[in-house]
Swiss-Prot record:
It catalyses: (1,4-alpha-D-galacturonosyl)n+m + H2O = (1,4-alpha-D-galacturonosyl)n + (1,4-alpha-D-galacturonosyl)m. The active site is at D312 (proton donor), H334. The keyword Disulfide bond applies. This is Probable endopolygalacturonase D. Involved in maceration and soft-rotting of plant tissue. Hydrolyzes the 1,4-alpha glycosidic bonds of de-esterified pectate in the smooth region of the plant cell wall. It is found in: Secreted. Glycans are attached at N24, N300, N361, N385, N419. It comes from the Eukaryota. Disulfide bonds join C129-C144, C314-C330, C439-C444, C462-C469.
């Protein structure tokens, strides 16, 4: 949706209804931003017939706290003057690739205006601010409970800094968010912190990481300087990141650390443009080390209902406790991973479940990796209902000889790996080995395999539980 072009006008009825923002800070704002979807929805979703949320556009449903009373109030308060016939819209379906995302950078003006404020669409009793220029972000963060970032261009060396959000604040990305070139390994384009905050996207938005400006086939292993982490989510508590469309990040996409009770849902990560070689990468894919979600030192985290096309780990948990990764679609990368573990400030992973997910055309399916010559602990890990296909290296891979430059072939036993369960893990290989387990002396224990069947590889290689791999 273009700035300033509301497809369907909204008529506030402030005296005749209940403000939907009383209990949920972003509900009213998203009805304003996603006006076309709201118009179609409200045409049939009436106050007198609010019985279910089937068919509700994903952005409206999530920003209205999944409560029909908020949806009803929003339709009453912000009801469209006219409405098109309703259409069915579902949440992100990981098994279907998204349409191609496109980005057009918007050049910054010499002087940025202050954010436009509106009390009509205020959430949580606060103010909604629409930001169209980078320079207005800091004042919006300081003064607004709801922030709409519309077609924002971040100049070189300029972070979209969302670290000081008000408690309960909501940030909505709209239009196309773009970034200038910043060849700096320590530069983070987006940083988010806060308590009870919601980070979400309006219908049709794109966050473009300008990856093509940096890709050289080496990622963080050398070559030119490039931002190592695109989005840093740290010290987020009881918060949500949802319904974001992100493409073309330089190296690692999400760096998630020191969070508690964080829900990440409905994310589309499309780095498919990095599959092709360029002049700097030779015959290799231009993008490298392009992890989707790196999770560290976090507790009670849920990552769900998301789609990833990249060139490295789809998800990598290197430390943390009580983490659920559910309903993921992973294409082209290195699979669903624990690790690498060892040699870091936090080397403990306990209580991680990967479930109901697909790993397609990737080098690995399910992987646990510990760094050679280091210490740590990996325990209570469960892979359940995982389907793999087109895997080129290992269907199930547990190895204790890992190094970023390549495995040593000689496992060490400083990292303990115990209570590991695989249930209903099935699929096919296009090359490589179905199962590869290389444990250090006495460092692996209590592995369980139930209804595990991966076929098509050139054989297996295991030294635990036995040399016949899955037999205890």
């Amino acid at each position: 949706m273009k700035r300033g072009a509301l497809l369907v006008p909204f008529v506030p009825l402030a005296l005749a209804c209940v403000d939907p923002g009383d209990s949920n800070h972003s509900c009213a704002s998203v009805f304003s931003v996603s006006s076309a979807a709201a118009a179609s929805f409200c045409a049939t979703f009436t106050v007198s017939a609010v019985t279910e949320t089937t068919g509700v556009p994903a952005a409206l449903l999530s920003n209205c706290d999944y409560k029909t009373k908020h949806l009803s109030s929003a339709c009453s308060c912000l009801g469209p003057a006219t409405a098109a016939a309703p259409t069915q819209t579902s949440a992100v379906t990981p098994t279907v690739a998204p349409t191609t995302l496109k980005a057009n950078a918007v050049a910054p003006t010499t002087e940025a205006p202050a954010p436009t404020k509106s009390s009509t669409f205020a959430g949580n009793g606060g103010t909604t601010c629409t930001v169209t220029e980078y320079a207005a972000i800091s004042s919006a963060v300081a003064s607004c409970s709801n922030i709409l970032l519309s077609d924002v261009y971040a100049p070189p060396s300029s972070t979209i800094d969302l670290q000081n959000l008000q408690t309960g604040a909501a940030v909505i990305f709209a239009g196309t968010t773009t970034f200038g070139d910043t060849p700096d390994d320590d530069f983070d384009p987006i940083v988010i912190s806060g308590t009870d905050v919601t980070i979400t996207g309006a219908d049709g938005h794109v966050i473009d990481g300008n990856g093509a400006a940096y890709w050289d086939g080496k990622g963080s292993n050398g070559g030119s300087s490039k931002p190592d982490h695109f989005i840093v989510a740290k010290h987020m508590y009881y918060s949500r990141i949802e319904n974001l469309n992100i493409q073309n990040w330089p190296v690692h996409c999400f760096d998630i650390e020191h969070t508690e009770n964080l829900i990440i849902s409905g994310i589309t990560l499309d780095n498919s443009a990095g599959d092709a070689p360029n002049s700097a990468s030779g015959s290799k894919p231009a993008a490298h080390n392009s992890d989707g979600f790196d999770i560290k030192s976090s507790t009670n985290l849920t990552l769900q209902n998301s789609w990833v096309h990249n060139q490295d780990d789809c998800v990598a948990v290197s430390s943390g406790t009580d983490i659920v990764v559910d309903n993921m679609y992973c294409y082209g990368g290195h699979g669903l991973s624990i690790g690498s573990i060892g040699g870091k400030s936090d080397n403990t992973v306990d209580g991680v479940t990967f479930s109901n997910s697909q790993v397609i055309n990737s080098s690995n399916g399910c992987r646990i990796k510990s760094n050679s010559g280091t210490t740590g602990e990996v325990s209570n890990i469960r892979y359940e209902n995982i389907t793999v296909s087109g895997i080129t290296d290992y269907g199930i891979d547990i190895q204790q000889d890992y190094l970023n430059g390549g495995p040593t072939g000689k496992p060490t036993n400083g990292v303990k790996i115990e209570n590991i369960t695989f249930v209903d893990v099935t699929g096919t290989m296009s090359d490589g080995k179905d199962y590869y387990i290389l444990c250090g002396d006495g460092s692996c224990s209590n592995f369980v395999f139930e209804n595990v069947g991966i076929t098509g590889g050139s054989g297996d290689s295991c030294n635990y539980p036995t040399d016949t791999c899955l037999e205890a």
